[in-house]
Amino acid sequence: MATNGHFASLGGDSSDKTAYEHGVQVIDENKEFNPNLSKYLSIEDVTPAGFNYHLISVFGSQSTGKSTLLNHLFGTRFSVMSELERRQTTKGIWMSKNKNTEGSMASNILVMDVEGTDGRERGEDQDFERKSALFALATSEVLIVNIWEHQVGLYQGANMGLLKTVFEVNLQLFLKDKNTTHRSLLFFVIRDFVGMTPLKNLQKTLMEDMSRLWDSISKPAGLEKSTVHDYFDFQFYGLPHKGYQPEQFVAETKKLSLRFREGHKDPSLDAQKGEFSDGGVFLPEYHRRIPADGFSRYAEGIWDQIVNNKDLDLPTQQELLAQFRCDEILREVMVAFDEAIVPFEDKQSQAARLGEPEILGGLGAAMRTARAKAVKSFETEASRYHKGVYQRKRAELESKIDTRLKALFQGQLNATHKSGINEFSDAVTTAVKSGQKKGTGYDFAEIVSEEVKKAMEKFEEVARTTTVEGTSWSDYSQELALYEKELAEVSARLRRDEMRRLATRVERWVQSRLGESVGLEFNALGSGRAGGGAPETGDKPTEKKFWDRVWNVFVETVLDAERRFTDRASSFDASLEEVDVGLWRLRRKSWGVLRAKIDEEMIEGNLLLKLRENFEDKFRYDDAGVPRIWRPTDDIEGVYTRARESTLTLIPLLSKFKLSETSAPPPLDRWVGHTPSSATAADEEDLPPIGGVDEEEGKSLEEEMTILSDSKRQELIVRFKKAADGVYVEAKRSAIGGMTQVPLYFYGILLALGWNEIIAVLRNPAYFFLLFVCAVAAYVTYQLNLWGPILKMTEAASNQALAEGKKRLREFLESSDTGRQAIAMSASGSEQHEMSRLNKQGKAAASDEDGDDL
């Protein structure tokens, strides 16, 4: 059969499962650890077993049949010594998984075949013997001591030196970890047992030797009275001679193999009295509590300390192993965690860069699933290692996961916050516009209340579905409070904006009403038939109370507007302070509207026209409103003087806004009121200053009420007098023109020259009838005052006929060949003019010449 060296090369260099059919060389003869041990355990499906595996080591002298024993017990294929050559076969330490298919045996049994002691190849070198014993004791649950029956009672032959080493090593391990008593089972398999000496006697001999060995070793303080039974359990079994009794040997080994199963300690047995268990050999206290997936790393660390002659510290090795494996498991878990979470992180980052908040759907479920899966996977794989390291690494894992999930959670809340604020503002604005379009009215406060409720419910829904139970960062009460606060701020801003729009609408209404009402009052100035002395009552108001009427109209209009504003503002859930500010602004804006309307009406051209109309009404009409027809005998100068002076009294009346009852300006300062304490700078910045109200303006109330300055008033008087003089001259001319008479001789000449025609008309009935009809028509036209319109219509018709004739002539000239030739000849060296712009003399009209100048 091939040697172990052949197997070592296969186990070390090939990943093929067939290369490990003889097992794997864990440590070679040069004390080198095989890094392929983890690969072998994976191939044999031991790695996922967790704690559900068992490790057995076999000790004994070289060439005593250790490998043969293991092959028969566990179905392994360790190399055995050739019967023809007495030389070393097992080199270093080999391992193989139990291949025995007996169902009653424990699963995942790993067997280590340790190089035999007392071999000639190593001679006096006992270093490897000690190191291998220490390695086996640190890793194995059961130590099988393979001895022959005739060696019982001997020191060297019974491997007493090796067992003494085992005892010393065990104490060394105990000193490093006093909190744990490392128990192991020493299973003596007595080979070539013939039964001449009862097994009980052999047990007694071996136990006496064990006690002497234990007493002979040096013990640390506090352990002087300890016994070997405090650290080891013992079992014994005798096997027949393999060569002389092969069938019995096979049967007994099969029987012995059944004892390699999980068992329990029988408290009724007393080892010191020679009472030993013959049940299952694998007790829970024997297990080193190293998970299968970390065994190779643990074994490598143990061997590294042993081979470098360092004090073996199993707790430290277990912690180092736990540190290494927990880090590996943590990395593996985080890979799966990243696959689930990174897409959400990327989406959130991109949305943040674009400045477009996006609520990630399914984020909460993904976060909870990923976290639970990661923690569960880590717990399943890492909880089998050192408890302190596991707990520390689990806390580290949870910290890493929670840090990233918290960032996602906060980003989700921020996105919900921003989008919620935008949606809330848009929803309120849309609802308000919809109410305005329908014209049915709307309750702004109700709209805001409903939208706030929807926004809060949506935020809470997103936050609730994104939380991860059991985490401190899932408390979103602070974010919810901030969101509610900002909603309140936005609501207040929207309410202020809506009140501004309401104020604007009311101001436009005031402007419209004042423009109409005040315009009527100014238009009434053009009708002066009542005169300045009109009665106080009746349909003809006196001009002296002009400003009283304007002020009353203004106050009533603004009061009506204030009622409208207050009623509408109540639906906004506005505070009293906001309403006060709105009314205060409305009064100031309304005064500005009135003053602008007054200034518009008092433009010099408009005022002069109204003064002329007022004068003409007084001059051209009598007190009853009947038009005057001037005769030479009428007192034109007297009427003119009275009308002019009466109209001139309007100019000083209109120059200052004064009430007739008090002869003082209206109480504008009291009417506007003081600036409300709740008014902000933004509320005042668009308001024009008012004299007598705003102290910083520097204008008094008297100056604010001055409509016309003295210079403008004097200029207006001069211009009005000129206009009145023109009306007077026209009236004088009409009176004098009425005095012109046709000379009497003119009628005699007319009768003499037209006698024949008169006789012809009178004699001809047709002519006479036509003359009669014309006379009647002329009389009727005169009585109806239609001569003027008829003459105007006749003139307009003649002008239209002339324009149409010019147009037709131009079209004819442009469309005919003769006309185009004539136009071309007249155009050379002369100016061109449209025919429609020629005057009666055939020359260019003045407007045409002016256009050429531009």
From Swiss-Prot:
The chain crosses the membrane at residues 742-762, 766-786. CDD domains: GBP. GO terms for cellular component: endoplasmic reticulum membrane. It is a multi-pass membrane protein. Residues 50-299 form the GB1/RHD3-type G domain. The keyword tRNA-binding does not apply. Keywords: Coiled coil, Endoplasmic reticulum, GTP-binding, Hydrolase, Membrane, Nucleotide-binding, Transmembrane, Transmembrane helix. InterPro entries: G_GB1_RHD3_dom, P-loop_NTPase, RHD3/Sey1, Sey1/RHD3-like_3HB. Its EC number is 3.6.5.-. Cooperates with the reticulon proteins and tubule-shaping DP1 family proteins to generate and maintain the structure of the tubular endoplasmic reticulum network. Has GTPase activity, which is required for its function in ER organization. Belongs to the TRAFAC class dynamin-like GTPase superfamily. GB1/RHD3 GTPase family. RHD3 subfamily. This is Protein sey1. The gene is sey1.
